[in-house]
Amino acid sequence: MDRVAGQVNSRRGELLELAAAMFAERGLRATTVRDIADGAGILSGSLYHHFASKEEMVDELLRGFLDWLFARYRDIVDSTANPLERLQGLFMASFEAIEHHHAQVVIYQDEAQRLASQPRFSYIEDRNKQQRKMWVDVLNQGIEEGYFRPDLDVDLVYRFIRDTTWVSVRWYRPGGPLTAQQVGQQYLAIVLGGITKEGV
């Protein structure tokens, strides 16, 4: 019984991975249940054995990704010694997500705004607010403790970091000439060069 359950869960995971790649490449609207079933070599009806709808697949992909990301973020905020190290950790965790959850990040970037208006996906807006608060708190702490320049517009810095980080998923490809960590370190050096207080 457990072995069968494991096989079902494994197949479900394979189908989710396939769906994520298709959603990221084609977009949610352009990807049908039939497309996913054809890609998996099964009938559409067989896909419904694993998922009630395409929306369930998207929900599971985004929830899983956001749960993972925020667990990483919380761990960094709770375990690092100072705001500078926290900012560095949050920054690099975002690039880790781009490397290891590439399709989910693309889906999130392309579809989150539209999906957030649907009751099933209301958690997306909550997560966006939590993300903003986490980053803004770290930036404010960094200013208060003398790590970052006191004249910074924290909201502007947050938006700059958010947009430059997540938009890189559009051109970055896992397995390319640079790892996400290398890209993240270069981006981080540019950001820190602009916000750190002299002498830090």
Curated annotation (Swiss-Prot):
Domain HTH tetR-type: 9-69
Any GO BP annotation: regulation of DNA-templated transcription
Keywords: DNA-binding, Repressor, Transcription, Transcription regulation
Single GO MF annotation: DNA binding
Alphabetical list of Pfam families matching this protein: TetR_C_24 (PF17932), TetR_N (PF00440)
InterPro entries for this protein: Homeodomain-like_sf (IPR009057), HTH-type_TetR-like_transc_reg (IPR050109), HTH_TetR (IPR001647), KstR2_TetR_C (IPR041490), Tet_transcr_reg_TetR-rel_C_sf (IPR036271)
Biological role: Controls the expression of a small regulon that may play a role in the utilization of cholesterol.
Designated name of the protein: HTH-type transcriptional repressor KstR2
Gene field: kstR2
